[in-house]
């Protein structure tokens, strides 16, 4: 297991590992893409335990080990984020999520009753599940610590509970997160939203981030480790900038405004709208749109040519970015 954690802040641009199939060919592409990205200045890599049946995390682990063992980088020079909360499978063991639950999780006290379901996604706030997932993610990545560990799509569970029930469960889970930060397994944590920002007028998805921040303060004071909010934001989905859904100190704000007020860093997912944006906009237009409002953006790719195109944009066009730091590629 590789010791240490990133001594750099999250990069303005991160490489995402969500897309692709379970094939060895795609895994080889991801390993090479990650190595290419890191060698050329994209030092932040984002994943999740459920991505590609754990293949994505394992591909990250292979790439990181090769880069670090060959002396190209040190652990302190890369920033690794992952996510937990959704039921996952293990493609290498030929275990889809439900079979993984019955064969690997039920004997550890996790049952289907722990999860809430929406459109085939099963989400839980049970800390016991996160404990198992975190240890598995660390194993997959070959690391002793993850720099950011997100709570993945908690809106699914929220939609099935009363307000009080949901925030009570979140307080217990945040207590677990803070404990893992003090143990040295997690550096920071955050929330990766999906439906709340995509469907801002659906009250069932709504979560008050000020209330979550106050829970973190209650659990661990002002030096708590709750730092990042991830959500879809692109030229075709701009609700986070245009709709005032959050209340901060009695003032209605947009998600982006609320995060800034709470000193939470914003992370944009799906900057190209799952590829649909290319039908109407140039890559530079879409990245311009995102970088002016968000601190960080995750760009998913396993294609070095695509990564190079993104690198060219960032090297030449980041002067207007409102993120907390400039792109550090060389």
Predicted regions mapped to residue ranges:
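Beta/alpha (TIM)-barrel catalytic core signal, keyed to glycine-rich beta->alpha loops juxtaposed to Asp/Glu
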Residues: 9, 14-17, 24, 28-30, ...
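Acidic (Asp/Glu)-rich catalytic clusters
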Residues: 3-8, 38-39, 64-75, 139-143, ...
